[in-house]
């Protein structure tokens, strides 16, 4: 198992600071990192080396907590503790802040683009999730403020192909939202975690959602449509979400991030015990009660908490991670024989 994750490279991405989050562009050629130094750095390869292609330092007054690329790859959004979200436009190797989105009362914790590129979601310590509409002139308008959570909202993520939004919160729940009429509504609340839910990730099909928590577990939730063969009850025309698997006993501290590889289906976690773990669904396991095996466990992946793991969208097995130690590491994951 120790040979299944091999270090490719390590870079001091945000020296003397925490590196909070990573995001690959859609073509998998660039990686954005952000940190407590208020900067965003863009990484790319030259030969076999990862180098910093540009530094975005003018947008924010405080920590940059999350970054997200638009589906077209021409824009980068950044969420900051200064309560704003910046939209950066890519122009060859340069990035220009073209819009600053304001409205949240406190730190913005996460930002995510819908697969169409026409919608953006942000969430904040002010307990709200905002949905923004983007028009052809790159004007951003808030079309909905969702206040379903009772505490700090940590993360937002969109379904890979539908306009279905999910959020994770300090209130121990995951919530799902969809558009109804001309507004957005909460259509499901996923309860089961016993502490803060830090991150969530859809599987490649969008039928399952993984969530990770301060309770040291990963939960896998599955969507059931009305009239499903399994007899899972649904309310009206809304799908129902049910926890079908809990990964417990593997992590010794808070799990800060979970990433579901869109190419292979491998599930990676970032943990407060300085480790990275990878899980794979067992061949032939029951889709209604799947089982997962730990296929990689790198104990000292970083010298401090691991905050984020991100699979490259085009190159199977390429995984990036970042940590409170300020570093970004690039790993090659090799699927064990027999899977």
Swiss-Prot record:
Its main location: cytoplasm. GO terms for molecular function: DNA-binding transcription factor activity. Keywords: Chromosome partition, Cytoplasm, Repeat, WD repeat. The keyword Mitochondrion does not apply. CDD domains: WD40. A motif (LYR motif) lies at residues 176-178. SMART domains: WD40. InterPro entries: CIAO1/Cia1, WD40/YVTN_repeat-like_dom_sf, WD40_repeat_CS, WD40_repeat_dom_sf, WD40_rpt. PANTHER family: CYTOSOLIC IRON-SULFUR PROTEIN ASSEMBLY PROTEIN CIAO1-RELATED, WD40 PROTEIN CIAO1. Belongs to the WD repeat CIA1 family. This is Probable cytosolic iron-sulfur protein assembly protein CIAO1. It comes from Mus musculus (Mouse). The gene is Ciao1.
